[in-house]
């Protein structure tokens, strides 16, 4: 049953269920700026996986320096995270680690890195099944993020209640 892995367009607003992912062997996760902590969530669930972090330089030197420090922090906190710099590095990592099932961070509009047809076609040709992982928080928040920040802002308390986060003040 591969219903959690889709080789095609990421399904809109279908929340991922890590319980279904636990049973997959040869599991890999790719981190990037869209989600730098997904591996921690899955590690807490006791899942066994390989992990790499895609770092792409930004044109703005301040943003680039900031992103470099964050990526260094991720790698320092988990020495099992492998750095990759481009899609070819990812393909090599997939082959070297014998990854057959791949988790990618869910990508929002304007933030697409992996939802690129040549990349997806190549990993499919490598016989790797993939899924774009949508965190529950993001799935709940997307419905309020359609009309600008102020619509989102007025619904923050609703989101906090859904996440069972209470104001401690």
Which positions does each model-derived feature cover?
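Trp/Phe/Arg-rich N-terminal binding region typifying the photolyase-homology
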Residues: 2-169
């Amino acid at each position: 049953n591969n219903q959690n892995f889709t080789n095609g367009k990421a399904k809109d607003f279908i929340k991922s269920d890590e319980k279904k992912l636990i049973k997959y062997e040869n599991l890999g996760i790719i981190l990037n700026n869209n989600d730098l902590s997904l591996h921690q969530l899955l590690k807490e669930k006791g899942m066994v996986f390989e992990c790499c972090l895609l770092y792409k330089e930004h044109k703005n030197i301040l943003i680039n320096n900031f992103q470099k420090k964050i990526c260094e922090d991720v790698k320092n906190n988990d020495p099992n995270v492998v750095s990759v710099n481009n899609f070819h590095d990812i393909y090599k990592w997939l082959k070297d680690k014998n990854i057959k099932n791949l988790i990618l961070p869910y990508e929002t509009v304007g933030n697409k890195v992996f939802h690129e047809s040549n990349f997806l076609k190549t990993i499919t040709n490598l016989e790797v099944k993939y899924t774009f992982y949508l965190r529950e928080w993001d799935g709940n928040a997307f419905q309020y993020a359609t009309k600008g920040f102020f619509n989102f802002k007025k619904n923050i308390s609703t989101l906090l209640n859904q996440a069972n986060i209470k104001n401690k003040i």
